[in-house]
Amino acid sequence: MDVNVSYKDTYSVITYQVWEPIDGGKNITLIIEYDADIVDNGILFKTVSIPIGGDLNIKNFHINFVSPYYLTYQEPDGNNFQIPKKTLLIINAEFSILPLPKLPVHGYVVFWLSILCILIIIFVYTELRRKK
């Protein structure tokens, strides 16, 4: 297997080339591990977007995030999905220092909407109490 790394202005491209024929019904397992500074850091939430694509059909794609933070969002959700050839799939994930469960929407949206709702309820409550 040949590995080629090319550096662009703001990113790097890692190319893996398999030069041995793959027999029909057979497959190869390719495990890619790397460290990269691709995380958008916030105060409570961190997001990452990873582009995946190739010149061949990917029939069983699995991604595993190892992080000290809680995984609160992943799109596409789950693992073991397919990626058609010549298609770019972007995997979005969000992590938080807060112990939130995995949600169908970004955790920061739920968090800040909850804070806003609580503030509105407190404001309405204090205004109603003040008028009495």
Curated annotation (Swiss-Prot):
The chain crosses the membrane at residues 105-125. GO terms for cellular component: membrane. Keywords: Membrane, Transmembrane, Transmembrane helix. The keyword Membrane applies. It comes from the Archaea. Its main location: membrane. The keyword Transmembrane helix applies. It is found in: Membrane. It is a single-pass membrane protein. This is Uncharacterized protein MJ1395. It comes from Methanocaldococcus jannaschii (strain ATCC 43067 / DSM 2661 / JAL-1 / JCM 10045 / NBRC 100440) (Methanococcus jannaschii).
